[in-house]
Curated annotation (Swiss-Prot):
The keyword RNA-binding applies. SUPFAM superfamilies: Translation proteins SH3-like domain. One of its GO terms (biological process) is translation. GO terms for cellular component: ribonucleoprotein complex; ribosome. This is Large ribosomal subunit protein uL24. The gene is rplX. HAMAP family: Ribosomal_uL24_B. It comes from the Bacteria. It comes from Haemophilus ducreyi (strain 35000HP / ATCC 700724).
Length: 103
């Protein structure tokens, strides 16, 4: 099945501590999760690696969010939207279900 949310899509978070925040999808993971830029930040404790000249400390990173907790953002309606698929000129394209506009 084709992915409804892809890399570089602008999404809005539907549930969790970052609800109603918007961001760009940086990575889509095969286990049904996405990583969104600037959303779901966690603090990782990293050890120093002297061989690489890397200092240790606390590092903020984006954690994965389940794809069911994000929805694609429709810029014309300024709301979260659902995605549909249709064929145009023998190509499968994604479209917003609210206004039939191609993504």
């Amino acid at each position: 099945m084709a992915a409804k949310i892809r890399q570089n899509d602008e999404v809005i978070v539907l549930a969790g501590k970052d609800k109603n925040k918007r961001g760009k999808v940086t990575k889509v993971l095969p286990n049904g999760k996405v990583i969104v830029e600037g959303i779901n930040l966690i603090t990782k404790h990293e050890k120093p690696v002297p061989a690489l000249g890397k200092a240790g400390g606390l590092v903020k990173k984006e954690a994965a969010i389940d794809v069911s907790n994000v929805a694609i953002f429709n810029p014309t309606t300024n709301k979260a939207d659902r995605v549909g698929f249709r064929f145009e000129d023998n190509k499968k394209v994604r479209f917003f279900k609210s206004n039939n506009e191609i993504i």
